[in-house]
Swiss-Prot record:
Ranges where the Disintegrin domain occurs: 47-111
Biological role stated in the UniProt entry: Strongly inhibits ADP-induced platelet aggregation on human platelet-rich plasma. Also avidly binds to the laminin-binding beta-1 integrins (alpha-3/beta-1, alpha-6/beta-1, and alpha-7/beta-1) in an RGD-independent manner.
Protein name: Disintegrin lebein-1-alpha
Keyword Metal-binding annotated: no
Other facts noted in the record for this chain: Negative results: does not interact with the collagen-binding alpha-1/beta-1 (ITGA1/ITGB1) and alpha-2/beta-1 (ITGA2/ITGB1) integrins.
Taxonomic source organism: Macrovipera lebetinus (Levantine viper)
Length: 111
């Protein structure tokens, strides 16, 4: 028996943001996106990112997790404020995590 799942994939996992697709159960790497009069094969691993932080249906952090990826995200949690996320090069200064985002904001000051 073939099971059919309706899944919405976000841009972070597959470049068809907000597209509704129909998937047949079986090998994840063999799923296809079905459009009217058109079938497009998903690239290998499109649905199986292997990221334990990511809800594969919503492409958002799983319940209780802060982030999916980023320079200030480790083990699905934001790194502490003040953690170096980008080491200084040349006359630049280090960039630091804020503790409330997975992004690494640029330090506006120079040495």
């Amino acid at each position: 028996m073939i099971q059919v799942l309706l899944v919405t994939i976000c841009l972070a996992v597959f470049p068809y943001q907000g597209s509704s697709i129909i998937l047949e159960s079986g090998n994840v790497n063999d799923y296809e996106i079905v459009y009217p009069k058109k079938v497009t094969v998903l690239p290998t691993g499109a649905m199986n990112s292997g990221n334990p932080c990511c809800d594969p249906v919503t492409c958002k952090p799983r319940r209780g997790e802060h982030c999916v990826s980023g320079p200030c995200c480790r083990n699905c949690k934001f790194l502490n404020a003040g953690t170096i996320c980008n080491r200084a090069r040349g006359d630049d200064m280090n960039d630091y995590c804020t503790g409330i985002s997975s992004d690494c904001p640029r330090n506006p000051y120079k040495d």
